[in-house]
Swiss-Prot record:
Protein keywords: Dioxygenase, Iron, Metal-binding, Oxidoreductase, Virulence
Record lineage: Eukaryota, Fungi, Dikarya, Ascomycota, Pezizomycotina
Species per Swiss-Prot/TrEMBL record: Gibberella zeae (strain ATCC MYA-4620 / CBS 123657 / FGSC 9075 / NRRL 31084 / PH-1) (Wheat head blight fungus)
Protein name: 2-oxoglutarate-dependent dioxygenase FGSG_00048
Cofactor note: Binds 1 Fe(2+) ion per subunit.
UniProt GO MF annotations: dioxygenase activity; metal ion binding
Catalytic activity, EC: 1.14.-.-
């Protein structure tokens, strides 16, 4: 479980490249993995111009007329890929006040004989080149480079936990399953449905293996919850990615690495600078890295050295994690990724998979119950 941290660690990626500084980097990474579950990585090997272009073109896409964005709405895709209209997504806590476009890697569609969760694989929907020139080229390039970085970072995570370097990367599978999700959050003054203090996205833990988030602008909206239940801000750091552990990595390590609850809160002060000047909408680019969806929980569990397990702030976290997640990941990993898509994008689910919506609702309710049970045990409620 997350410790009583009061700030989010910032790690310098170049320090991982030098033999003289790598040991200190790995020690900092290990501490962040075990005690916080959230950290920022400064100066990743992704060109700054590419980062800026991806944010700029994402903003241009969201500025398109609504009817133009709806041409590629996700309800047209059984893979859930495409534009998600404002206020149409949800977490267990309710409606999320955001709009987004979900993009996948450039992979072919699989046949109907494959398991239903593999229907998530296939081509993305893209705005036409005239509407947002360069959008597809830049976002595909960013997706490719952040994915390559995430694979390299999985090796660093294994090394920080003193496991063989390929312990985690061999679970990722080929082709790699991932999602890039450019997202826009409007200030409350621009969203009639949202009040000051509404959730851009409600408190949740990512179902992914790892998440790599590029924050645009200097908005102060992202918050992480510590063991005491206090919300700790994640201020944007120029040239840094926000990295957080997903539930999959917590399962894989038996609770040694901690998936931390976080949210995006929409308060007026988060959308203004120090002089009170409006910063406009918040643009972010989360990248979600998954393991091979065909694997089961038994396939992915790894042996973390005992002396690393001993670093967990409260040893009960190890045993609780296995019990807690067995109720969510009781089939293959892909089944649960698919259920998460159904509950996050209910309009898509009702169109393409109406017979599965009841199961998805039951899974979401069970997830929420277990979350509340665990939080009560930790003293959050």
């Amino acid at each position: 479980m997350a410790s009583n941290f009061t700030s989010i660690p910032v790690l310098d990626y170049p320090s991982s490249l030098s033999p003289s500084t790598k040991p200190a980097f790995l020690a900092e990474l290990r501490d962040a993995l075990v005690k916080v579950g959230f950290f920022q990585v400064r100066d990743p090997p992704i060109p700054l111009k590419l980062q800026q272009d991806a944010l700029r073109l994402s903003a241009q896409f969201f500025d398109l007329p609504t009817e133009k964005k709806l041409d590629i709405e996700n309800v047209h895709s059984k893979r859930f890929l495409g534009y998600s209209r404002i206020n149409s997504e949800s977490t267990a806590s309710g409606t999320d006040y955001l709009e987004s476009i979900l993009l996948g890697p450039n992979l072919p569609e699989l046949g109907p004989e494959e398991p239903v969760y593999l229907h998530l694989q296939g081509p993305s929907q893209w705005p036409d080149e005239v509407s947002v020139p360069g959008f597809r080229d830049v976002l595909e390039s960013y997706h490719s480079q952040i994915q390559d970085f995430s694979i390299e970072f999985a090796r660093l995570i294994a090394e920080a936990l003193e496991m063989p370097l390929d312990t985690l990367t061999k679970l990722l599978g080929q082709p790699l399953f991932s999602r890039l999700k450019p997202t826009r959050y409007l200030p409350p003054s621009m969203n009639p449905a949202a009040e000051d203090g509404s959730h851009g996205i409600g408190p949740h833990k990512d179902i992914a293996f790892m998440t790599y988030l590029l924050q645009g602008g200097t908005h102060n909206c992202l918050e992480v919850q510590n063991k005491l239940g206090h919300w700790v801000p994640v201020p944007p750091v120029p040239g840094a990615l926000v990295v957080n552990i997903g539930r999959l990595l917590e399962v894989i390590t038996g609770g040694v690495c901690v998936a931390t609850t976080h949210r995006v809160i929409l308060k007026r002060q988060g959308f203004v600078d120090g002089d009170g000047k409006s910063l406009g909408p918040r643009i972010s680019l989360p990248f979600f890295q998954f393991v091979n969806p065909r694997l089961t929980v038994d396939d992915v569990l790894v042996d973390v050295p005992h002396h690393i397990k001993d670093l967990v702030p409260d040893q009960v976290a190890t045993t609780e994690a296995e019990t807690f997640f067995s109720g969510l990941f009781n089939n293959c990993i892909g089944d649960n990724i698919f259920v998460n898509h159904l509950t996050t994008y209910p309009r898509v689910g009702k169109r393409w998979y109406p017979d599965l919506m009841q199961l998805a609702s039951e899974k979401q309710a069970e997830s929420k119950r277990l979350d509340e049970q665990r939080r009560a045990t930790e003293g959050h409620i």
